[in-house]
Amino acid sequence: MSISLDDLASNMNFTTGGKSKAGGVTFLPEPERRKRDYTIISADDHIVEPPHTFEGRLPAKLADRAPKVIEKEDGSETWVYDGMEIPNVGFNAVVGRPVSEYSFEPARFDEMRRGAWDINARVADMDLNGIYASVNFPSFLPGF
């Protein structure tokens, strides 16, 4: 099924697409590696902070207050710090998934293409797409 930009603009329900009909998420097939004829630098990429981002990076006296990812009873994953829960928003990491599954709903790391949050997988994805470098913007962890 093909969805055009006009379809998306006329019906914003796609932002709550969520899971595939089979119950999990669908990842599109890996693209073929692109030949690089000239240098391409992506100037507007977004990355999700990996779950271990803050481990060992704060002074010892603040380590117990560092943001961390926990798994909740319902199986979802969320960032926790300073008494707040901040979920990973699925729309931050829709790369490699069909538009019908785009969602603002919380997402687990295993529901994201690894290149959305793992630097080595990100570089491999950039190589596949012929991207030499990119400017990355963080997701949403207020205060950091």
Question: Where are the regions that the model predicts?
Answer:
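Helix-coil boundary/capping segments in enzymes
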Residues: 1-144
